[in-house]
Amino acid sequence: MLLLECKPDEVLAHTLGVARRDCLHHNDKGRVCNALQKRQGCVAMIDEDPSSAQPPYLATLVIESDQHGLRVFRDPARQHRVVIVRPRLEEWLIATAQHAQVQVADFGFSERGNAMHRDINSKLPKLEELIEALLCTRSVRLLHLQRLIA
């Protein structure tokens, strides 16, 4: 089971090959963490959101790796993997596109994280196209995320 924060996370997961039935959408990082505390053997993907308060659950996790803008933690007691996208999905996607030499503007998105964050929910089909374009380039960052969540 993959626990996610928001609709753009769901689009990303589905485009990377995670079945819809295997995704649980929660509305924010705190709710994802609460759900993790009640389950066993899940994977979660959340934004780091460094400027916001962090759920206490995150302090109980053990770091596994930190590469490609993804910090991976595990919860040994509950057998969870928590993938933290740094700093937020939007900035991570912009950096991933730049690394792959794909222009996010070609898909109607701004190169600025806050602007992309504001628009992303109204452009989910374009987000899917962007992710598919990144997959076609064999983006190392995106393929790393795919291995972690799929």
Q: Language-model segments: what does each one mean?
A:
Residues 1-150:
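Acidic, divalent-metal-binding catalytic cores of TOPRIM
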